[in-house]
């Protein structure tokens, strides 16, 4: 058992967002990192013989789940696919409320993909807090919609990729692909193995996208970006995403990738239950890095934007707490909707029912936010792993 994972948390003046509802004056009991009880009243007897935290302000919410994380802390996962890189990435993102992530390896050589998978398998075996799987974004993508993905590495699925994708020691296996680059039978085989298929970086027409969904694809990667657009006569991937009610869409809410009106349209179409926040963060997140080498070129940071040498957007420096604030305030969706899009919705997409909410039986992954929705403290599996300087427990 990890240290400090048996305790009580007392919300005495703070709010707790549980199952979509804000409540005050409650107590949460944790045993071995799992929530074993929620009480609507507070008694001094409960804390007499058990360690406890007392929150008198702010809001406690479930930990944020980011399904698309390319780097952080000054390192790209593709460039240094090691266990130590994963630890550093998780540390960089954790201060912004991320308690679970899928490290993302973008289009590259098979050797890089294999090294990334080995690092994730090692992290899971070592129980590195927050590393729950891997996201392969490419290399089975459209040349026309590749974005910053290197064209020389785009390819179909070979036997070497099959051996990688069918591994059972990687936790969550999320694969982004363009439906025109594979067959429905290949999608069916991947889904049957337990992989989750997301569609993206694609110039496919609506019919091709719907066939991929029928084959088992269940998500869309960074909605609007790198995909065929919705028009009056051709729905494209965006239209197919809106029309398929049981699929999930990731969206980058940094004010750069998606116009706020487009973001609201996506929310109207998909709802809080099927629109999820992602960062697509690159190495500068959580560091003072202003530029970095990216394959044969360079990516430069300009404020909150990253662009490659061709002027294309190249990931982001967005963090999950900022994405939640943007959804809650800029889009006026409110805290409850914004948090669900960062917690319960991605948990359902990646089929991890133990994550994504503050409820009995769930893992004690929490974020304590102040009244401006800034992160004060972070717990993963009941272990306090981040505490801001201004955070004070009563």
Curated annotation (Swiss-Prot):
What CDD domains does the annotation carry? NagA
According to its UniProt entry, this protein's organism is: Shewanella sp. (strain ANA-3)
| Record: residues binding Zn(2+) | 137, 201, 222
Domain of life where this protein originates: Bacteria
Source gene? agaAII
Is Metal-binding among the key words of this record? yes
Q: Which family does it belong to?
A: Belongs to the metallo-dependent hydrolases superfamily. NagA family.
Q: Which residues form the active site?
A: 280
Q: What is its main location?
A: cytoplasm
Record localization: Cytoplasm
- What protein name does the entry list? N-acetylgalactosamine-6-phosphate deacetylase
């Amino acid at each position: 058992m990890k240290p400090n994972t048996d305790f009580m948390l007392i919300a005495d003046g703070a709010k707790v967002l549980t199952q979509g509802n804000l409540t005050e004056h409650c107590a949460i009991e944790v045993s071995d990192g799992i929530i074993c009880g929620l009480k609507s009243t507070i008694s001094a007897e409960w804390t007499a013989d058990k360690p406890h935290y007392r929150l008198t302000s702010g809001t406690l919410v479930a930990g944020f789940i980011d399904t698309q994380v390319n780097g952080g802390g000054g390192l790209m996962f593709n460039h240094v696919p090691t266990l130590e890189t994963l630890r550093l990435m998780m540390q960089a993102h954790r201060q912004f409320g991320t308690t679970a992530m899928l490290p993302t390896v973008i289009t590259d050589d098979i050797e890089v993909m294999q090294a990334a998978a080995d690092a994730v398998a090692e992290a899971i075996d070592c129980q590195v807090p927050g590393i729950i799987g891997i996201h392969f974004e490419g290399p089975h993508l459209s040349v026309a919609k590749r974005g910053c993905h290197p064209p020389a590495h785009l390819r179909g699925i070979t036997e070497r990729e099959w051996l990688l994708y069918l591994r059972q020691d990687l936790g969550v296996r999320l694969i982004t692909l363009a439906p025109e680059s594979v067959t429905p039978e290949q999608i069916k085989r991947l889904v049957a193995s337990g992989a989750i298929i997301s569609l993206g970086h694609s110039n496919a027409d609506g019919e091709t996208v719907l066939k991929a969904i029928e084959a088992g694809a269940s998500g869309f990667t960074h909605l609007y970006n790198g995909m065929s657009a919705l028009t009056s006569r051709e729905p494209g991937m965006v239209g197919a995403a809106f029309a398929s009610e049981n699929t999930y869409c990731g969206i980058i809410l940094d004010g750069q990738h998606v116009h706020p009106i487009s973001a609201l349209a996506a929310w109207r179409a998909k709802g809080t239950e099927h629109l999820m926040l992602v960062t697509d963060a690159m190495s500068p997140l959580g560091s003072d890095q202003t530029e970095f080498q990216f394959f044969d070129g360079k990516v430069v940071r300009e404020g909150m934007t990253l662009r490659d040498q061709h002027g294309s957007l190249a990931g982001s420096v967005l963090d999950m707490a900022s994405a939640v604030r943007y959804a809650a305030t800029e889009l006026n969706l409110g805290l409850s909707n914004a948090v669900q899009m960062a917690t319960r919705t991605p948990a359902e997409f990646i089929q991890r029912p133990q994550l994504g909410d503050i409820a009995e039986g769930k893992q004690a992954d929490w974020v304590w936010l102040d009244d401006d929705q800034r992160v004060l403290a972070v717990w993963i599996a009941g272990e306090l792993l981040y505490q801001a300087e201004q955070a004070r427990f009563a």
